């Protein structure tokens, strides 16, 4: 018997010093992360972050496994310049396809100042005081053939209380979203096809990537009513469906869709439907063509639920939340390059050239944007930190907008830390 074992050194304790820029907005953070606290596999992070919206001092702790049990525990606390954020969760998840049961709960207390944007500029501000709670349990017959089915149920609270804020730089509260308090029991279903493939140099560099192909579907339905303490009667629903395939060693594709919203007062409210498709063609071990198409359709969106495109979510050559509306489409063409360059055995180096094109339709409280199709081109560097156990990739991009107003910078410089290439 011949056995080959490959290992990779990971720095569990590391400083976290980051600077980012997208959509013409800077952000920075400093702190440290420990991925193996006390040698027990627990994760601890402390730090400070700052961006245009808020300054934050935060602490987070996560125990992915308590003792020899499969229970996960996590807690987050953040003291922000505009409020606070507290999260607490305990869960025994479906940790494998053959896992038979799950249970857990989570709590949320989040207060923050939110902004609305038009053409990349802040036009409105308000305070969002959010409370959330969810308790759930689930059962599964396990993996039968190549399919796993899971049945879940629980109860949830989703509450948003909105209030006006004092003006900052002359911009305060003009329009205030409507308060919402939804308390409801719910039931859920999930189907997973056991069809995984292992790839490398797809969304990471030099790491094995488990890609789920085949079918994956989930749905959840709940009913809020005054008898439960809600401020309205509403059906709350959400779901997702995806299917992928790899017909040969050089091509793969994945199509996914999601939807969420409410049905109240005889019509839909806060409804958002998304379809996302990607295609990857690998020419060799060092270059891949990546194509992605995404569409979003909103219906009676809540005021605190804006739909926008900009430098922060796909249109890399444009300011933050530049185009706003009720429906959007985005196409990305990207040629990815992977190299063997491994400086100081710290970072794997790659690159990309890209073109983005997007459009937003529909109305806003200030009227339609009517910006038409917005396009940009650019190139960038990718750095994958091999000493981190989190699989993060540093993006350094330069993008040039081909459309838009004369007030837009002709070069957008973007730095971000992402979970994929």
Which residues does each PLM region occupy?
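Outer-envelope beta-barrel architecture signal
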Residues: 11-15, 26-28, 40-42, 55-57, ...
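Feature captures outer-membrane beta-barrel proteins of Gram-negative bacteria and organelles
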Residues: 28-37, 55-68, 86-97, 103-105, ...
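Transmembrane beta-barrel wall of Gram-negative outer-membrane proteins
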Residues: 62-172
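Structural signature of outer-membrane beta-barrel domains
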Residues: 22, 51-53, 80-82, 95, ...
């Amino acid at each position: 018997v011949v056995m080959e074992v490959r290992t990779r050194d990971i720095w569990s304790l590391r400083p976290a010093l980051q600077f980012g820029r997208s959509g013409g907005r800077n952000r920075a953070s400093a702190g440290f992360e420990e991925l193996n606290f006390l040698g027990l596999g627990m994760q601890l992070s402390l730090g400070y972050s700052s961006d245009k919206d808020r300054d934050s001092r935060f602490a987070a702790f996560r125990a992915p496994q308590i003792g020899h049990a499969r229970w996960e525990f996590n807690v987050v606390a953040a003291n922000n310049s505009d409020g606070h954020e507290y999260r607490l969760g305990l869960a025994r998840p479906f940790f494998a396809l053959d896992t038979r049961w799950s249970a857990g709960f989570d709590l949320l207390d989040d207060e923050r100042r939110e902004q609305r944007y038009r053409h990349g500029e802040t036009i409105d501000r308000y305070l969002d005081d959010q409370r959330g709670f969810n308790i759930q349990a689930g059962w599964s017959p396990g993996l039968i053939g190549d399919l796993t089915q899971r049945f879940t149920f629980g109860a949830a609270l989703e509450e948003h209380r909105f209030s006006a804020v004092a003006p900052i730089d002359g911009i305060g509260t003009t329009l205030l979203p409507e308060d919402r308090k939804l308390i409801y029991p719910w039931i859920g279903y999930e189907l997973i096809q056991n069809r995984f493939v292992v790839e490398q140099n797809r969304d990471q560099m030099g790491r094995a990537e488990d890609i789920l192909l085949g079918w994956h579907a989930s749905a959840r339905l709940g009913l809020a009513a005054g008898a439960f303490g809600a401020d309205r009667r509403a059906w709350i629903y959400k779901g997702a469906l995806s299917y992928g395939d790899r017909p040969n060693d050089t091509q793969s594709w994945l199509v996914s869709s999601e939807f969420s919203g409410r049905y109240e007062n005889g019509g839909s409210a806060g409804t958002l439907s998304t379809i996302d498709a990607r295609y990857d063609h690998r020419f060799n071990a060092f270059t891949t063509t990546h194509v992605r198409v995404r569409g979003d359709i909103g219906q009676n969106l809540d005021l605190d639920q804006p739909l926008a495109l900009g430098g922060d979510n796909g249109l890399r050559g444009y300011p933050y939340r530049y185009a706003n509306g009720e429906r959007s489409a985005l196409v990305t063409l990207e040629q990815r390059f992977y190299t063997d360059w491994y400086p100081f055995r710290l970072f794997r180096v790659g690159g990309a050239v890209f073109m983005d094109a997007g459009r937003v339709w529909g109305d806003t409280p200030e009227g339609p944007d009517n910006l038409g199709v917005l396009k940009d081109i650019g190139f960038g560097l990718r750095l994958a930190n091999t000493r981190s156990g989190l699989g993060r990739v540093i993006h350094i991009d330069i993008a040039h907008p081909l459309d838009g107003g004369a007030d837009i910078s002709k070069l957008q410089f973007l730095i971000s830390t992402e979970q994929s290439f």
